[in-house]
Amino acid sequence: MQCPYCHHTDSRVLESRSAEGGQSIRRRRECLACGRRFTTYERIEFVPITVIKRNGDRESFDRSKLLRGIMTACGKTNIPQQKIEALVDDIEADLQLRSRREVTSAELGEAALQRLRHLSEVAYVRFASVYRQFQGISDFVAELAHLQETPASPELLTISQS
């Protein structure tokens, strides 16, 4: 592993431990040339997922883009960062378990909404307003009425396999 400080290629591992719920290994390393310490992560490399946008364009699934959108929806709700990241981890794990390598942005948005509803109704409405492109107050009122009429399902559905 190359040292990020002096770019020397030899280092020794001081400590290794499981991270990100067992999805990666965190290693503390020490450069044998300069003696500085740094952290590396080893992760499983998953098969890339392609997202089919509303207009038909295709782009690679971007975890950070989904995380940003959900974090924006959760702003000022006092939801811990760890819970938000766990929600995104759950969606990403669901995507990797599927037999298909493509997912529509609609499926991705619905998966996020379903999980957000269990986390925070405020975050749910905020995310829905962007995802479903609310045009006015009537859209908010309709969504709030739907929230009140329809109980949240006790278990989370996975993203469609078909």
Swiss-Prot record:
unnamed ZnF: 3-34
A Gene Ontology BP annotation from the UniProt entry: negative regulation of DNA-templated transcription
Swiss-Prot/TrEMBL keywords: ATP-binding, DNA-binding, Metal-binding, Nucleotide-binding, Repressor, Transcription, Transcription regulation, Zinc, Zinc-finger
Family matches, as InterPro entries: ATP-cone_dom, NrdR-like_N, RNR_NrdR-like
Pfam family, one: Zn_ribbon_NrdR
Sample GO molecular function, one term: DNA binding
Top-level taxon in the UniProt lineage: Bacteria
Cofactor(s) needed: Zn(2+)
UniProt domain ATP-cone: residue ranges: 49-139
Annotated cofactor note: Binds 1 zinc ion.
Family, similarity comment: Belongs to the NrdR family.
Role description: Negatively regulates transcription of bacterial ribonucleotide reductase nrd genes and operons by binding to NrdR-boxes.
Name recorded for this polypeptide: Transcriptional repressor NrdR
